Swiss-Prot record:
Homodimer. The gene is thrS. This is Threonine--tRNA ligase. The lineage of its organism: Archaea, Methanobacteriati, Methanobacteriota, Archaeoglobi, Archaeoglobales. Zn(2+) binds at residues 288, 340, 464. It is an enzyme of class 6 (ligase). It comes from Archaeoglobus fulgidus (strain ATCC 49558 / DSM 4304 / JCM 9628 / NBRC 100126 / VC-16).
Length: 619
């Protein structure tokens, strides 16, 4: 089904003459004011599923443009693959019924009509949508069918290395683990309530939905871009320090490439499809494709192993189901740190798996997510577990907390072992962050080989590793963690190294603005992001605004501070909702404190004008 959506001051049409395909109609036409007009072509293969998705697409646009009236206008000129008249009329009536929560008008099918329309001309006033049914439905069903063939057995591996059936485990004291287990077993991914981080990302002017793009695509304001860039730089550096070689690969690939086609047939997924001049391409949903093709044309010997390559994909694309998309948690375009390790044998693969597990713990901890902030899941085939029981049990020693084990009766996926660190948010939804998999299939599929010490070519094992998970999801986890801080009576905040403004200097009056600017400049020379609230507002409002922005350090400057050389500094991390922690310190002491908290982290300068009076508002 093809849709052309026009937000109009008015739409009027007049019925002239019927065709042999016309549905019964005894009116002359109508005029509708303040209306979203949906010019609609019903295509071959469209069904009730397509109608529901079309209604959802129309509803989404109507809500964005605040339209209360919708006109469905049959328009054959949007497609060359039209459904028959009987089907078209039936589905158009169903579309009308699906949108019954609006005031709906439907122009008759099969009549020659004259029409006039006045398009409003704003950025969302002219949009098109192409609604597919069969392909996505087939992919979704294929995924479900394959998943249903694999039988899962659920256990908890205790710190004492006892494997306990989930039903028999005592979750007392492990409430987050209980929520995670329930979420995993229920497999209910749809979002019914907006999670707290969505309000935070908007209020802090970090990010927001882009209404002119597809669902699940985000725009980042200067503050959000800074946070995201710092995370990208930090994660990339950790992978390179670990020994990975950074590469870059294309974002789209030929759907009919022999190797890639076999992979997509084996593991169907929801992809964006791009039509080229002569070929169809799919947008990557991971860096695997490009990195594996690169490795397949490389000369590798046992001396090179373990070999690690890394790419930060900006972006990877996956057409997640619309009902699962929300904020930064689940997107259709996302930034994924993707490292692949080539290992000569299973022993080397297990060693790397263990090391990358520890690396992932370290990366999340340095970002600002402690082990108590997430739950661990290990997914494994029964055969691999039986053969490597001691190794699997050793994983619990790293964090010394119970972990969820999903054990499959046989292998369907390309891996035999996988771990995930999952963040459970305020709505009890779980999202995977760090993950590592041992892949036993793709080296052969892609023709990746290495020359062993005996001179023979062999297929290696491959580890897939994302030490943090998608960067957007890390931001989501940090913001959701802030909500938990609020629930505990603390003040929500980002880690100091990620805070867009680390220190705000507030003059008590206009007379002290110049002094505040000088102090801010002195602090900023130490590689610290400092701004000055020079607005003509009361001191109380300036302090409240700084608190609303989660500024880690708020320094007030007045006569007393200038004379003493000591600033009155509010320390957010040590404050509570009931009491503000205020200390006196010099500008040098403040700079040293901030610098020590950010040691070893990347730095970027302030992304906005230093003076608040010069800043635009992105809300």
């Amino acid at each position: 089904m093809k849709l052309l959506l026009i937000h109009a001051d008015y739409m009027e049409y007049e019925v002239k003459k019927k065709t042999k395909l016309a549905e019964p109609f005894d009116g002359k036409g109508e005029r509708v004011e303040e209306v979203l007009v949906a010019f609609t072509s019903v295509e071959k293969g469209d069904d009730e599923n397509v109608v529901r998705k079309a209604a959802e697409a129309i509803r989404e646009v109507a809500e964005k443009v605040n339209a209360e009236r919708i006109m469905i206008y049959p328009y054959a000129h949007l497609s060359s693959n039209l459904a028959d008249a009987e089907t078209a009329v039936k589905l158009l009536k169903q579309l009308e019924a699906e949108l019954s929560d609006f005031e709906v008008h439907r122009s008759p099918f099969g009549w020659y009509k004259a029409f006039r329309i006045s398009c409003k001309g704003h950025p969302l006033s002219e949009l098109s949508r192409e609604i597919g049914g069969e392909a996505e439905a087939e992919v979704t069903q294929a995924l479900k069918d394959e998943e249903e063939k694999v039988v899962s057995y659920w256990y908890i591996l205790t710190p004492e290395k006892e494997l306990v059936e989930v039903e028999k485990f005592d979750f007392t004291g492990y409430e987050k683990l209980r929520k995670f287990v329930n979420y995993e077993i229920a497999k209910r991914r749809a979002v019914d309530v907006t999670p707290p981080h969505v309000e935070y990302m908007r209020r802090l002017e970090l990010a927001d939905y882009e209404p002119a793009s597809d669902s699940g695509h985000i725009r980042y304001y200067p503050k959000g871009r800074l946070v995201k860039t710092l995370l990208e730089q930090f994660i990339t550096r950790k992978c390179i320090d670990y020994g990975a070689m950074e590469v870059e690969t294309p974002i789209m690939y030929d759907r009919n490439h022999p190797t890639l086609r076999r992979y997509l047939e084996r593991f169907p997924a929801r992809q964006y499809i791009i039509k080229g001049d002569k070929r169809e391409f799919f947008l990557r949903f991971a860096a695997c494709f490009g990195q594996f093709l690169m490795l397949s044309s490389s000369t590798i010997t046992y001396r090179n192993l373990p070999l690690k390559i890394y790419e930060l994909t900006r972006y990877s694309f996956r057409k997640e189901q619309r009902g699962e998309l929300v904020g930064l948690r689940r997107l259709r375009a996302f930034t994924m740190p993707d490292m692949h390790t080539v290992a000569k044998d299973m022993e080397q693969a297990k060693e790397e798996f263990f090391n990358q597990y520890r690396l992932s713990v370290e990366v999340l901890r340095e970002i600002g997510l402690e082990p108590e902030d997430y739950e661990v899941a290990v997914r494994i085939t029964k055969d691999f577990y039986e053969e490597n029981r001691e190794f699997v049990h050793s994983l619990v020693d790293i964090l010394k907390k119970p972990i969820l084990i999903e054990m499959w009766d046989h292998r369907f996926f390309y891996f035999v072992l996988k771990f995930e660190f999952n963040f459970v948010d305020a709505l009890d939804k779980a999202s995977a962050l760090s993950t590592v998999q041992i892949d036993v299939e793709n080296a052969e599929r892609y023709g990746i080989t290495f020359v062993d010490s005996d001179g023979k070519e062999k297929h290696p094992y491959i580890l897939h590793c994302s030490v943090s998970g998608a960067v957007e999801r890390v931001m989501y986890a940090l913001l959701e963690k802030a909500k938990f801080m609020l629930d505990e009576g603390r003040l929500p905040m980002l880690p100091v190294w990620l805070s867009p403004t680390q220190v705000r200097v507030i003059p008590v009056s206009e007379r002290f603005v110049d002094a505040a600017i000088k102090i801010a400049d002195d602090i900023a020379r130490n590689g610290i992001r400092v701004d000055v609230d020079d607005r003509n507002e009361t001191l109380g409002k300036k302090i409240r605004d700084a608190q609303t922005e989660w500024i880690p350090y708020i320094a007030v400057v007045g006569e007393k501070e200038i004379e003493s050389g000591k600033l009155a500094v509010t320390v957010r991390a040590e404050s509570t909702q009931k009491e503000q922690k205020r200390v006196e310190m010099s500008a040098e002491e403040l700079a040293e404190r901030v610098r020590s908290e950010c040691e070893g982290k990347p730095f970027m300068p302030l992304p906005l004008p230093k003076l608040l009076s010069l800043r635009p508002s992105f809300r």
